[in-house]
């Protein structure tokens, strides 16, 4: 059947990348189709039941600032919230939400089903319709043809997916779901640069068989933080504890004894696993000097006894899993509900993508999520939103948009993937961002919401809330600049009494806030401020980090000069005098779009960038005089 409706955007896959891609395109007014193999698994958390964390929550906030769904779903489904790095600087603080899988998934599905311009259809996609070098649509498992101006692929671990438990293996996209074999074969036919990666998940445990009394409880923060700029604590369901226990030498001996049947250590798995989320057998091997490793027992939801033992991801045979779980303190009688497993899947070298996440080889075809070599819900959601918005803009022949490294962690993510490529699952960290003081979790809305409004991603309600917040920041900052404390006036005396600090001369409230040990809460009490915690936080950070932020702005100005120098798509690196063969080959492989991108390619020296710049200028001069 040839479906009668022609779509602007078709999104294949209903995971974290696919849902954000479909929602973004639909919010922008494009006729959008979301194809999923199973409507019941839309927004499913296939691995750990959590959103956020170091570097990751920055991405979630950016998705949220652009009108995305992930942060609000985390607020509606979160059963424990914590601020990580709370004693460190604002740049590296991160929010983490332990999520109820069912509630999170329900929140995502509700958002999808109530989004205008979005159709959902349950069918696996088996083929892409490509005419010349342009995608024209999709063919499903039943042979239904859907036509579209653009297609976004967000296939997760489903492309050629193989599940491993010990030396046993079976085809699967994840436990209980079939893989995407036909589509994987079709993509290989298109001569895109394909590789194999792997990820894994731990066995799930029945909480009724665990002795929590010998474990360390890990409560959430109080007052509870929120994930979304539009979130409220009233959205949160009941809050619960997680628990911490540890592996021991007995556990490690059991694991070592099973390595001869490990698919990782017998060469059965060829794909590379995530460096920063290693399996327990990998930890024992890589950190052989450690006597124990932490295990976090995380509830999977309020209406289930299922626990996620974070820290013991494994693909060892089930009998070894059984023994290693029962060797851990408090889990001596643990009942395993589901075995752990590893999954191996196809991914495509992201260096074959443009910065918009469109493939260089096929016009109108976009990739987002694990297909690009990343790991994590947050990384997937960020790519999905960018791919969806750019597919939407291309469909209407509008200029596409991708944030720069100084604008967003999304920009860092895309630039890293396309400039450096990846041979292992890529995870975001704050350390990857050179301008992280400007790219804080708390100011994602200030960086992106105005842009999102211009792109059509941000609705009236979010825009009004953002404008109200920024007006409040401006008003309160101005007020505090005109409130004065002096050694002999009542406010000055109150300040000294309250803080025990010295006050030798007249100071504005803003000047007092600049002091290292003074916080906005104290200034609010001193001056009778009634602004929200969010507004107070913005004022405090802006005041305390002003000098550092200004210095980063100067660094960004220098970078922008390089960013503004575009490298023509057909630039001939062979004619650049003085470039080594090695550097020439690297530049020809990556095909950087700007001098700034060229400077970030490993092995490309500043001198080489200068040579390219001189050649570009010579070419431009020649064209002008011709």
UniProtKB/Swiss-Prot annotation:
The lineage of its organism: Bacteria, Pseudomonadati, Pseudomonadota, Gammaproteobacteria, Moraxellales. NAD-binding protein involved in the addition of a carboxymethylaminomethyl (cmnm) group at the wobble position (U34) of certain tRNAs, forming tRNA-cmnm(5)s(2)U34. It holds the Pfam family SAM_GIDA_C. Belongs to the MnmG family. The keyword Cytoplasm applies. Its cofactor is FAD. It is found in: Cytoplasm. HAMAP family: MnmG_GidA. GO terms for molecular function: flavin adenine dinucleotide binding. One of its GO terms (biological process) is tRNA methylation. The keyword Cell membrane does not apply. NAD(+) binds at residues 273-287. This is tRNA uridine 5-carboxymethylaminomethyl modification enzyme MnmG. Keywords: Cytoplasm, FAD, Flavoprotein, NAD, tRNA processing. FAD binds at residues 13-18. Transmembrane segments: none annotated.
């Amino acid at each position: 059947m040839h479906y009668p409706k022609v779509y602007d955007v078709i999104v294949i896959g209903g995971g974290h990348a696919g849902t954000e891609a479909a929602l973004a395109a639909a919010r922008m007014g494009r006729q959008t189709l979301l194809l999923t193999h199973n409507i019941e698994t839309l927004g499913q958390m296939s691995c750990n039941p959590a959103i956020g964390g170091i570097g990751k929550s920055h991405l979630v906030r950016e998705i949220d600032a652009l009108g995305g769904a992930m942060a609000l779903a985390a607020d509606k489904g979160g059963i424990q919230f914590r601020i990580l790095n709370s004693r460190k600087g604002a740049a590296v603080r991160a929010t983490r939400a332990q999520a109820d899988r069912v509630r999170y998934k329900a929140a995502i599905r509700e958002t999808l089903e109530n989004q205008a311009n979005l159709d959902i259809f349950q069918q696996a996609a088996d083929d892409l319709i490509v005419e010349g070098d342009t995608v024209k649509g999709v063919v499903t498992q039943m042979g239904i043809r859907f036509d579209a101006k653009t297609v976004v692929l967000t296939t997760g671990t489903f492309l050629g997916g193989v599940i491993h438990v010990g030396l046993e293996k079976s085809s699967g996209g994840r436990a209980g779901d079939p893989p995407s074999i036909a589509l994987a074969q079709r993509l290989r036919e298109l001569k895109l640069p394909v590789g194999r990666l792997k990820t894994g998940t731990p066995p799930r445990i029945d909480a009724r068989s665990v002795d929590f009394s010998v474990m360390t409880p890990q409560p959430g923060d109080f007052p509870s933080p929120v994930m979304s700029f539009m979130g409220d604590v009233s959205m949160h369901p009941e809050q619960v504890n997680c628990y911490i226990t540890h592996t021991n030498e007995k556990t490690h001996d059991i694991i070592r004894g099973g390595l001869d049947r490990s698919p990782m250590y017998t060469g059965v798995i060829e794909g590379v696993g995530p460096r920063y989320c290693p399996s327990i057998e990998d930890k024992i091997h890589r950190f052989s000097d450690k006597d124990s490793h932490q295990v976090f027992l995380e509830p999977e939801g309020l209406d289930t006894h299922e626990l996620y033992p974070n820290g013991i991801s494994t693909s060892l045979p089930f009998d070894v899993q059984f023994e290693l779980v029962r060797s851990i303190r408090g889990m001596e009688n643990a009942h395993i509900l589901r075995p752990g497993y590893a999954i191996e899947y196809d991914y495509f070298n992201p260096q074959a993508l443009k910065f918009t996440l469109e493939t260089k080889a096929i016009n109108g075809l976009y990739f987002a999520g694990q297909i690009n070599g990343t790991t994590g819900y947050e990384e997937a959601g960020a790519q999905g939103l960018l791919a969806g918005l750019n597919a939407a803009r291309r469909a209407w022949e509008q200029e596409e948009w991708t944030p720069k490294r100084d604008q967003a962690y999304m920009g860092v993510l895309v630039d890293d993937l396309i400039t450096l490529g990846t041979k292992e699952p890529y995870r975001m960290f704050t350390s990857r961002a050179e301008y992280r003081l400007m790219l804080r979790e708390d100011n994602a809305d200030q960086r992106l919401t105005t842009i999102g409004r211009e792109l059509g991603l941000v609705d009236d309600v979010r825009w009004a809330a953002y404008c109200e917040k920024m007006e409040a920041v401006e008003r309160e900052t101005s007020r505090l600049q005109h409130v004065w404390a002096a050694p002999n006036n009542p406010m000055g005396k109150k300040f000294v009494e309250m803080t025990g600090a010295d006050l030798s001369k007249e100071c504005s409230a803003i000047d007092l806030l600049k002091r290292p040990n003074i916080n906005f809460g104290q200034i609010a009490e001193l001056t009778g401020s009634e602004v929200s915690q969010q507004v107070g936080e913005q004022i405090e950070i802006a005041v305390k980090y002003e000098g550092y932020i200004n210095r980063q702005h100067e660094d960004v100005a220098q970078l922008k000069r390089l960013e503004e120098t575009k490298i023509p798509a057909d630039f001939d690196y062979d004619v650049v005098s003085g470039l080594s063969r090695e550097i020439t080959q690297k530049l020809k492989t990556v095909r950087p779009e700007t001098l700034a991108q060229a400077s970030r390619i490993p092995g490309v020296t500043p001198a080489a960038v200068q040579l390219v710049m001189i050649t570009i200028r010579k070419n431009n001069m020649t064209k002008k005089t011709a």
